[in-house]
């Protein structure tokens, strides 16, 4: 006798029902929780894939209000550096600015500038008392580079400083009065406590919706595997300031993954941890019991994933999301819908099924900010996109995600493919279109917030003819729409 657990549905099997509405799309509130303590301003995450998310895309997505997860197909040092780049891009108050001592030479300052990409360094004593600042203007025309910074620095008496906790308005006023671009933060004993730059204020004004931590820095996540030897990687990422750690596996409901989560939670009680992937309520509950802050749902729905075909295992995504949400009811642990998102309507459906946010890969893989070069093929521009279960990605380091770390390169059993996606331009344009579609959904269903969409919206199940009717039909498309691409 066949052991059929249940019937399961995915995105194209359902539509949302329109309802009486007082909500205008432009008034819909898109903020949502990634975890209990991390709030997103849009419900979008980027996948931890080596053709999707490195620091450049993570910065761009965080500026739009989402959050990117840096992939792990790189050395520990490089992944930590990628995280650090995001955290330093927009700093608000730089709580630990790089400093020099009074004995540092101008030559050393020039070397630091070449290495770090910025030229301003506070000068402090051994006990961190502030004695001056050295900037690019101070050393620009100096020929004797062997003299100490004290010879040309702006001394303590002429420094522009503010006390800890000073308001943004006061800081900006001081910058304007003194015509400076950097203000140093000091305590009552004139010990250095941080630095504020005008560039960070300008960035904040341009991107008011950015997803930031309590220090005004952009938020970023990073992925690690569940196998042995990842302790050092986790330590390095935490030291680099990662906001949320993704313990990533193709099968999150396995004891090795659960044990890795327990160990990480024991070592870092306050670290935000996402666990995945699962496709059942039991899997979601097991991750919650192990100590995760959010659960990632999706086995095999991704465009480049062949897990369901190679293994015969998976659960269609709408049912998988709904089952996970039901199992986690009352725990306060959000669900992330990972994979299968092709259109903005799919984002809306995933959230209406109960997810707090979605993780996308192919949607962002062709953007300007994604890793990789633009390729020309038959007169069109493309970027490469591959699954982390593809042979190429597994040989670069993601084989542990599929429990194949001990396999030789010629013995790997892939669960993904390598391909290309059309070049899509800047990430912000993609986000604008996707969030615009989501806002329209919220207007049609009468849901003013993401939480209302999660709990109020109703589905109807549709037939194959229903989805055919939903798509463009009986016409030849002559001009492609930015939010409706069939490939």
Curated annotation (Swiss-Prot):
Residues engaged in binding IMP: 303, 338-340, 361-362, 385-389, 415
Binding of K(+), residues: 300, 302, 305, 469-471
Keyword set, alphabetical order: CBS domain, GMP biosynthesis, Metal-binding, NAD, Oxidoreductase, Potassium, Purine biosynthesis, Repeat
Description of how activity is regulated: Mycophenolic acid (MPA) is a non-competitive inhibitor that prevents formation of the closed enzyme conformation by binding to the same site as the amobile flap. In contrast, mizoribine monophosphate (MZP) is a competitive inhibitor that induces the closed conformation. MPA is a potent inhibitor of mammalian IMPDHs but a poor inhibitor of the bacterial enzymes. MZP is a more potent inhibitor of bacterial IMPDH.
Domain of life: Bacteria
Residues engaged in binding NAD(+): 248-250, 298-300
Record's catalysed reaction(s): IMP + NAD(+) + H2O = XMP + NADH + H(+)
Pathway: Purine metabolism; XMP biosynthesis via de novo pathway; XMP from IMP: step 1/1
Active site: 305 (thioimidate intermediate), 401 (proton acceptor)
UniProt GO BP: GMP biosynthetic process; GTP biosynthetic process
Cofactor: K(+)
GO molecular function: IMP dehydrogenase activity; metal ion binding; nucleotide binding
Pfam families in the record: CBS, IMPDH
Enzyme Commission number, as recorded: 1.1.1.205
Domain (CBS): residue spans on this chain: 93-152, 153-214
Matching SMART domains: CBS, IMPDH
Sequence similarity: Belongs to the IMPDH/GMPR family.
NCBIfam families: IMP_dehydrog
Primary role: Catalyzes the conversion of inosine 5'-phosphate (IMP) to xanthosine 5'-phosphate (XMP), the first committed and rate-limiting step in the de novo synthesis of guanine nucleotides, and therefore plays an important role in the regulation of cell growth.
Subunit structure as annotated in this protein's UniProt entry: Homotetramer.
Protein's recorded name: Inosine-5'-monophosphate dehydrogenase
Gene that specifies this protein: guaB
